[in-house]
A protein has these predicted regions:
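Short coil/turn linking the two alpha-helices of tandem helical-hairpin repeats
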Residues: 156-157, 163, 212, 237-244, ...
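An aromatic- and glycine-enriched ligand-binding surface/loop that stacks and positions planar moieties
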Residues: 23-86, 166, 194, 198-205, ...
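Conserved, well-structured interaction surfaces
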Residues: 47-51, 55-56, 83-159, 183-195, ...
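C-terminal substrate/ligand-recognition segments
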Residues: 353-427
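Long, intrinsically disordered, low-complexity segments
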Residues: 21-22, 54, 62, 66, ...
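Bacterial N-terminal signal peptides
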Residues: 10-19
Length: 514
């Protein structure tokens, strides 16, 4: 059962690097800045502050369903969206989306990162006797460091080079130099951003403890395994962006192995657990979760299911969740899309149980089949309308299957086919897919791992990032060498960000296209 308290806290609204004017630099002056001796005086207030950081990160990724635009639609694996805005991406690889400026704006990420950094600075100075124990103080510091790391990692995957802000922005005075000029923060090389994120992840690992499935905050707040999962992702992304950096590959192997051995999490056996196991995974806080965005009506952390294109349920669901078939927004399982073609032509996939668990009527009617990972809901008791439903599906960020397949990829990069295939087969076995018998060369293994990740994490906004990290673009017709040479796989920076901070340079591919 989901059991996290919902907190509200007025926090710094960081407009440095964002789109706000100087006059509204601080949307609301926070009590933590105005009266630090009053606010930072108890564990309860520190807990409230950390809850605010989680909330800011949640806002950054779910605003206008941006997490799907960044990590799912760009992957082009299973769902062909009927939505005209998504078609900018699917049709021509155009990331300059109509009515979706937020997808190019990193403002919300910096709000989350700056607040997390601020929390770290203040909690560090709080005496231990303000907390129940040193362990509790460390936990809160570790969770704040985790959010800061996760936020910068997301920005690195979306934009590549981004500014690093290593100070708590508490006053507009901090944005003015001694000479009276506005302080400008230029974009920093992607690998430096990853180093910064990795440093914060390691800090988090050192401060947090492992948790246990069934614990009240399991998977919806960070524990040591959450931070190790984040480190695994950062390290392998780093390796993929730095010519198979051997140190980073090994760090990814070590981090994934630690999660697998120590997290207490276990895989969902789709064959034996069936729909019950699938539902538990999607609703959240299941035995396989490592970190998730909490969606719960009981704790005022939900929203009504609506057939609109500004939320992830509207963009992924269809009848009978909706009262009638939606042919204007909902996606369909295009047989020509990479993942659907793979499932249809690979004989090993004939009895893959995920086709029936993950999708509604997969293979029966491609036009009306849809992903079911965001279909879980509860009735709005205040309404007599049977279709007045609150979402109850968590957004899964890290889970245990991810660790097995990341480790498989890391070993494939080292050309260690044995352990790579072993981890690949562990995931296949849970879905009634026979052991892998294909080629053992790196290229063959990387394709097999990408394919497994494509079906296992469909809808979880992984495939777009997987393509960049693995440099694998089969099935994406608008990707070419010339585009990639100019880093066209990254998203453009919103022009208003650049106009307010001239030291920010647009990504080469997008120059002249906005």
């Amino acid at each position: 059962m989901k059991q996290i308290k919902s907190f509200k806290i007025y926090i710094v609204v960081l407009c440095l690097l964002g789109s706000a004017s100087c006059s509204d630099l601080l949307d609301q002056e926070p009590i933590s800045i105005t009266h630090p001796d009053v606010f930072w005086d108890s564990q309860a207030n520190a807990e409230q502050a950390v809850a605010g950081a989680y909330s800011l990160f949640k806002e950054a990724i779910i605003t206008q369903s941006n997490f799907l635009y960044w990590g799912e639609w760009t992957g082009m694996t299973f769902m062909n969206s009927r939505n005209w805005i998504v078609n900018y991406i699917e049709g021509s690889g155009n990331y300059v989306l109509a009515y979706r400026d937020a997808s190019m704006n990193w403002k919300n990420f910096y709000r989350a990162a700056n607040w997390a950094y601020t929390i770290e600075q203040y909690i560090e100075d709080m005496p231990v006797d303000m907390f129940d124990s040193q362990t509790e103080k460390d936990r809160l510091l570790g969770e704040a460091a985790f959010i800061r790391s996760l936020t910068y990692f997301y920005m690195a995957r979306i934009w590549g080079d981004v500014p690093i802000v290593e100070q708590s922005i508490e006053s507009s005075d901090q944005l003015i130099s001694e000479d009276g000029y506005i302080v400008e923060n230029a974009r920093v090389d992607e690998l430096q951003v990853l180093d910064y994120a990795l440093e914060a992840a390691n800090k988090s690992i050192g401060l947090l403890q492992y948790s246990t499935p069934g614990a009240s905050n399991w998977a919806i707040t960070a524990n040591k395994a959450s931070a190790e999962a984040l480190k695994a992702h950062i390290s392998l992304w780093y390796a993929g962006r730095d010519n198979d950096n051997p140190e980073m590959i090994q760090q990814a192997i070590d981090a994934t192995t630690s999660v697998i051995n120590n997290s207490g999490a276990s895989l969902i056996d789709y064959v034996n657990e069936g729909k019950e196991g699938f539902d538990e995974m999607c609703i959240g806080q299941s035995k396989t979760g490592l970190f998730e965005i909490n969606i719960s009506a009981d704790m005022n952390e939900s929203f009504r299911l609506l057939q609109y294109d500004d939320n992830h349920t509207g963009l992924t669901l269809n009848y009978p969740v909706w009262q009638s078939v939606n042919t204007g927004i909902s996606p369909y399982m295009d047989p020509d899309f990479y993942g659907n073609e793979m499932m249809a032509t690979d004989a090993d996939r004939a009895n893959d149980v995920r086709k029936d668990l993950f999708f509604y009527e997969y293979g029966t009617n491609a036009d009306y089949s849809y992903l079911q990972k965001y279909s879980h809901s509860t009735q709005d008791e205040a309404s007599e309308d049977a279709y007045a439903q609150f979402s109850e599906s968590n957004i899964l960020i890290f889970r245990l299957a991810d660790m097995y397949l990341l480790r498989a990829e890391a070993n494939a990069r080292k050309e260690l086919s044995g352990p790579a295939i072993s981890d690949l087969n562990e995931i296949r076995s849970k879905a009634n897919v026979p052991d892998y018998t294909g080629g053992t060369d790196r290229e063959s293994l990387m394709k097999a791992i990408f394919d497994e990740r494509a079906i296992e994490f469909v809808g979880e906004a992984q495939s777009g990032y997987d393509r960049i990290r693995m440099d694998y673009y089969d099935g994406v017709p608008w990707v070419n060498q010339a585009r990639n040479a100019k880093k066209g796989y990254f998203w453009p920076v919103l022009p208003s960000v650049i106009s307010r901070n001239p030291s920010i340079l647009q990504t080469e591919y997008w120059r002249g296209k906005l």
